Amino acid sequence: MQVSIACTEHNLKSRNGEERLISKQNAAAPNVVNAARAKFRTVAIIARSLGTFTPQHHISLKESTAKQTGMKYRNLGKSGLRVSCLGLGTWVTFGGQISDEVAEQLMTIAYESGVNLFDTAEVYAAGKAEVILGNILKKKGWRRSSLVITTKLYWGGKAETERGLSRKHIIEGLRASLQRLQLEYVDVVFANRPDNNTPMEEIVRAMTHVINQGMAMYWGTSRWSAMEIMEAYSVARQFNLIPPVCEQAEYHLFQREKVEVQLPELYHKIGVGAMTWSPLACGIISGKYGNGVPESSRAALKCYQWLKEKIISEEGRKQQTKLKDLSPIAERLGCTLPQLAVAWCLRNEGVSSVLLGSSNPEQLIENLGAIQVLPKMTSHIVNEIDNILGNKPYSKKDYRS
């Protein structure tokens, strides 16, 4: 900001003589004309100062980097909300896999590393994840204006009226989430599933209502199809309502189609960005399943039988083989395989933020280190990874070209 002002002042000084000359020439002109010319000169001066300032100092309006932490910040879709490109999620961990003390350690490490995005949902640990997150925020006393807190609505309770995306549940569910979080508002409220039982207009009107009431700043979608997101946008435009700004989508080395083909088209057409989750594919990419399923792992839990079956399947074994082939690339870049996988997600310019899920401080610190790997993700490295994976999706435009 100081540099910008200095540049503006410099241009103003250089034009002092010209302005005096113009003022003398127009002394007899009507006041309206003088005011119009003065306004034009002011706009021209500002435009000129901005024009010289931007290329000289290489300002990026899309991405900025914190000097102290090295964390990068991007716009959430085409909204003005700036989010850290790495966020901390609370699924499985908060209120379940880890203690409250470890949860506080993780949030502290994340915040001190420049993370400003913390994501949760009403369904996580039956609301306990929101309670723990809220308790930690209150204890730490971090400035609310420095944080981006997001939550998701759909599965609220056992009653029919306590789930879905009806106007009733969106309003009551968000109010309950705010009570658990001990917050006046969340920055983004997500519709955690599409709801075929509720008209799209009702959903969009309810989301617009909670934003207008100050309960949320923005709203987004999670696990919605491109067609459903487009319908929500169309309804918002038709009735002068607020459209979604972001879609939460699963994205990792083995799940690419939606984020790399479908969402970019939505971003360019209607400004919807991508906040991605599970960059390590529920731990599959961490490397701990290379020789089977350890008893202490998530896949060994009864409620994660589906994950165990996925790992020991034929496709799962093929994925482990590909991960072993990727290891030399990670070694060459001086990073771990998880860091390579997270950096690979971040190299996608259409991704606003990648949500990390960690069960211990060491794991979180390792994953946050992906920021240092990001500059090394050259087109050559990305192509090398694509050749090993063999699953790069192609859009209709790619086929036509």
From Swiss-Prot:
Swiss-Prot/TrEMBL keywords: Cell membrane, Cytoplasm, Ion transport, Membrane, NADP, Oxidoreductase, Potassium, Potassium transport, Transport
UniProt remark on domains: The N-terminal domain of the beta subunit mediates closure of delayed rectifier potassium channels by physically obstructing the pore.
Active-site residues, Swiss-Prot/TrEMBL: 124
Originating organism: Gallus gallus
An annotated GO cellular component: potassium channel complex
Residues involved in NADP(+) binding: 90-91, 97, 119, 192, 222-223, 248, 277-282, 288, 298, 357, 359, 363, 366-367
Protein name, per record: Voltage-gated potassium channel subunit beta-1
Subcellular localization, as worded in the UniProt entry: Cytoplasm; Membrane; Cell membrane
Catalytically driven reaction(s): a primary alcohol + NADP(+) = an aldehyde + NADPH + H(+); a secondary alcohol + NADP(+) = a ketone + NADPH + H(+)
Enzyme Commission number: 1.1.1.-
